[in-house]
Amino acid sequence: CTGHGNGIYLVDAALQSVRNAIFSADARARSYVERWTAAGIGQAVRPKTMQSLWPGQPNALLAWLRDHEPDAYARTRWVLMCKDFVRLRLTGQAAAELTDMSGTSLMDVGTAQYDPDILDRFGIGDAFDKLPPLRRSAEICGEVTPAAAAATGLAPGTPVAGGLFDVDAC
């Protein structure tokens, strides 16, 4: 499966939505990106992230949520992308797929791991524990649960793979 990249889907410890998703076209976090750019943070992390900063990325949205919706931020257990949220609903397993997270400015794409130094530079170091385990695109991340099967018509036990970031799937 694939889904749009970036934006943010937040779930709590019970795997329930914390708030409505914020899509990647949302610009509410523009001032954070402007501040980080002026301070040289974007240039400093670019060798690891290989990304330009923009307001619809999870780094900016997490900083905005921390400051403007602290209750939602505190209740968040997992930060997910669109298809990772769909996969969670199908399998009951929280995971993030590597190609999707590579566009978030939350990880070092050279090591294919989240980088706490990058998060610290954005002032969201405490979000590190909200990032789910990374999985590869073709990796089986779980199976369709009986509840998801009843809701979707899919066969229970159907394997569900990691999927691909929208741009990479094209």
Where do the PLM segments sit?
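Ligand-binding clamshell of periplasmic/extracellular solute-binding protein-like
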Residues: 1-4, 163-167
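Glycine-rich phosphate-binding/hydrolytic loop that grips phosphoryl groups
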Residues: 34, 165-170
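Short beta-strand scaffold segments in enzyme catalytic cores
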Residues: 6-11, 104-105, 169-170
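Active-site phosphate-binding/coordination module
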Residues: 1-59
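Gly/Ser/Thr-rich active-site cleft segment
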Residues: 45-165
